[in-house]
Amino acid sequence: MSWRSEYIWVEFIAGSRKPGNFFWAFILFLGSLGFLVVGISSYLDRNLLSLFPSQQINFFPQGIVMSFYGIAGLFISSYLWCTIIWNVGSGYDRFDTKEGIVCIFRWGFPGKNRRIFLRFLMKDIQSIRIEVKEGIYARRVLYIESRGLGAIPLNRTDENLTPREIEQKAAELAYFLRVPIEGF
């Protein structure tokens, strides 16, 4: 999603709150909870989960391994839920031609660098760069080449833009900023 006027262009960046992340965090939570309950059931020798009779799963070694997988899955699931709650990776890119300033903001993990904020002058922008890697894991990333800061990515690497979409986005941004386009 973006917003544009004559002098200002704001590009909003989606973070971790995507349907796929919700789906995998939920599935991982349920699966790891199931493993943990089966492991505890085998230890107590009681049916806490009525799908499997506890006598069929020995605590050593199957119950211990299932408990370990359940605990590990709960840790990974809690990590995914934290990234969703904190909305890691979301933010905006603001290009202001009237003031000649570019602001790039992203939310990170809690701590000293929770707010990632880059602010630099438009005259420091050398070009817009498109990096395309084809293959099984194809990725197309749009960068701003800047003096002093190097290449700054503008879109997420997991954003699956078609070649036409990435070229159009690069052309519009290059025209708005009045800089050349480089391709890789």
Curated annotation (Swiss-Prot):
Keywords: Chloroplast, Membrane, Photosynthesis, Plastid, Thylakoid, Transmembrane, Transmembrane helix. One of its GO terms (cellular component) is chloroplast thylakoid membrane. It is a multi-pass membrane protein. PANTHER family: PHOTOSYSTEM I ASSEMBLY PROTEIN YCF4, PTHR33288. It comes from Citrus sinensis. Belongs to the Ycf4 family. This is Photosystem I assembly protein Ycf4. InterPro entries: PSI_Ycf4_assembly. Disulfide bonds: none annotated. The chain crosses the membrane at residues 20-40, 64-84. One of its GO terms (biological process) is photosynthesis. It is found in: Plastid, Chloroplast thylakoid membrane. Seems to be required for the assembly of the photosystem I complex.
